[in-house]
């Protein structure tokens, strides 16, 4: 199998071009780079600079003020090593070596008025782009969700900006190979705008053809992961690839910091799916019954998202 991660132009997909190649990519890989989608490095820089300044210079009181008191509520600031994807996926107990700022369509926690203005604009651009690419996924697979495409895409998205600082020696690859554990996304599509490590190390990797492959930064290109919801709503026509964030070796620690702006196009809480189909597709679903809602699934999946100790 060809393990190359392809690049598609959203504008060309919208013109009906490259449909056979796009369908093969959705079926076999479930990830691709996307250009011409209205998201560039310039928009990312404005939002990134603001949140990195808050991460580095915000006081403890300011950070507490925008930290959600509800562990499963993905809003506001989340401190370094406060979450564990490994715990969520039952693959270990190590923390995610990152800090995070999260926002959605409502109930947000903003550090300032300027932050709210810039981040709301950035969120809206991400939401527009994610819906546009999701339309192409649905069109390419001949999928018409219950209630229609536009109702399905008028949903409950989530934006999470992760800052992965330079790792300490005890989190180097020799000690702990991963900054974040392998997982698939509970989304229709996930859009990622990343910045590279200064030393050239590629941290983000995804499973392609049975092995994890590097997903480097590409200027003015967005990385798209199809999520488990895409698999389910298309009846299994779309792959939801596992991906993780690798740790650098000791000799790569210097210059290993990076950022990743991750936009999850998630369905509404009452989106209903087939539990047997989810299991058949390889998803870890412990719910009873023939059908379940997205809220049922995500509620159980993220019950352990916030770490309670450094153990």
From Swiss-Prot:
Record-listed E.C. numbers: 1.14.20.1
Fe2OG dioxygenase domain segment(s): 154-267
Pathway: Antibiotic biosynthesis; cephalosporin C biosynthesis
Keywords: Antibiotic biosynthesis, Iron, Oxidoreductase, Vitamin C
Molecular function in Gene Ontology: deacetoxycephalosporin-C synthase activity; iron ion binding; L-ascorbic acid binding
InterPro entries: IPNS-like_FE2OG_OXY, IPNS-like_sf, Iron_ascorbate_oxido_reductase, Isopenicillin-N_synth_CS, Oxoglu/Fe-dep_dioxygenase_dom
Function comment: Catalyzes the step from penicillin N to deacetoxy-cephalosporin C.
Superkingdom of this protein's organism: Bacteria
Keyword Iron assigned: yes
Cofactors: Fe cation; L-ascorbate
Protein name from the UniProt record: Deacetoxycephalosporin C synthase
Catalytic activity as recorded in UniProt: penicillin N + 2-oxoglutarate + O2 = deacetoxycephalosporin C + succinate + CO2 + H2O
Biological process annotations from GO: antibiotic biosynthetic process
Keyword DNA damage: no
Enzyme type, top EC level: oxidoreductase
Gene name of this polypeptide: cefE
Pfam families linked to this entry: 2OG-FeII_Oxy
Protein family: Belongs to the iron/ascorbate-dependent oxidoreductase family.
